[in-house]
Structures are given as C-alpha cells and as structure tokens.
C-alpha cells in the first residue's frame, strides 16, 4: 500500500510540473487565498457477503469505506492528494491523521502550492486531537465541524444576542441601504479552546463559529414555544479573524461540500469498477 502511495504521489508531483493543477504561483490574477484540503470518507456499496473487508458502516449498507483527501483553490478544481480503501465497518477517523499528514507533505511538493496558506476542512467525524494536530504540525490551519458536546453548547449559550449577523442564505434579501443581508440564517463566533480534557500542551486555541437557523418543526403542537428556537451548526477554526472574518469563515467552511461531488464522480467512474 505504501509503495502504491509513493507511485501515486510521484505521478501527481510530476504532473503538477507540467500542468497548473492548482494554478501558477505568482501568475497574473493568481488566487492569493488558501489552498483547501478537504477530508471525507464515503461508503462504496457491495453485495457479496463474503467479500473481503465488506461490512456495515455509518450509512447502514454493506460496503467498503474510501477515505479521501483533496486539494483545491477558489479557481482550481479538486485534485486527489491521498486515498485509502478500508473495511466497511471502520470508524471514519481511523487513519485520518496519517492521511492528513501524508497529503500535506505531498501538497508541499506541488510547485503552485509552495508557500501557500493551507486550510484543512472536515466534518464532525474528524473532529479529534489526532487529525487536528496532524494538520497544525504540518503548518496548516483547520476548519472542522464540531460535535455538540457540553463545552460547545455552553459556548453557544454564552453568545450575546446582538452578536448574530445575517448572512446570504436561501430566501435572504440584501438591504442596499444598510449593506446587510436580511436573513433567517445568522452567524456569530466566540473564542474557543478545543480538547480541554487533554493536557495543556495538547489543547488548541481558536474560534468557534456558529450558524443558526430557526427550528421549523413540521409537526403541529398544542403548546407553542415561549421563544424562538434555533438549530445550530458550529465549527472550530484556527484561522486569523483578520484573514477570515466570521461571515467569510462560514462561507469558506461550507465550501467543504465540494468533496461530496468528488465522491459522486468517483463512484460513477473509477470506483464503479470495483468488484461488487
């Protein structure tokens, strides 16, 4: 497996020398922003119960688990940096820290990415010290969805009501007089230290960016609520607020969804040829 990784990484680096996979560094109009490294896993369905490694994963179907890391920019389509094919019942974060470390090492060898700022994005399945530490050790920033544990809920509860800012979202209206969005979706942030249950040297300071939308319960109720309730989506990021403010950080984090298109493309192409 490691030998195949070496072949794939050398091929990618050599290809980048001949084609601007992530854009040309220093070229006119070049994107001065981040290189985004997105990490995600997906289930590839199989049907033979005796197939080696097959099992039931988070999706509830029998299959194999593919773990992917891609790199992209605002102007360049995703490029696969690393991949692992794992047994279907494996937990999503298993081996993710090593994949992140390997992928960031490959990224540094790509000519256009030399000296670029790198942001690793992932969903809550990868919110763990090992994965975050691997990214930070390699010199990248992180933007990772958090799990709603007690510390996160307490941080959200402490956000001042005046701190919420409307954002561009479905059904939002832009007010030209005030230059703001009139929207049901709002964002706010608070300082946050991740992994406080670990020893002090392993705690990671950063920001907790929270997006909230009204809770729209389709079921009728005989007891209306006394106040508006919301659904919250929070993520932890180590980016500088002067580089990515609250609204921009939220937009940037939502861009992680691009890897779902990569998953779909692979399942309709290369991964479709796996024996099922």
Regions of interest found by a model, annotated:
Residues 1-71:
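Active-site-proximal, Lys/Arg-enriched surface segment
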Residues 247-251, 271-276:
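Short beta-alpha connecting loops at secondary-structure transitions
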Residues 47-52, 79-85, 95, 112, ...:
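Short acidic, glycine/serine/threonine-rich loops at helix termini
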Residues 90-151:
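Domain-level cores of phosphate- or acyl-group-handling catalytic modules
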Residues 1, 33-43, 78, 118-127, ...:
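Short, conserved catalytic/metal-binding motifs centered on acidic residues
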Residues 56-112:
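Electropositive, glycine- and tryptophan-enriched low-complexity nucleic-acid-binding patches
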Residues 39-41, 71-73, 82-85, 122, ...:
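Glycine-rich, histidine-containing beta strand-loop boundary motifs that form or position
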Residues 143-265:
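An anionic, glycine-rich sequence signature occurring as long contiguous blocks
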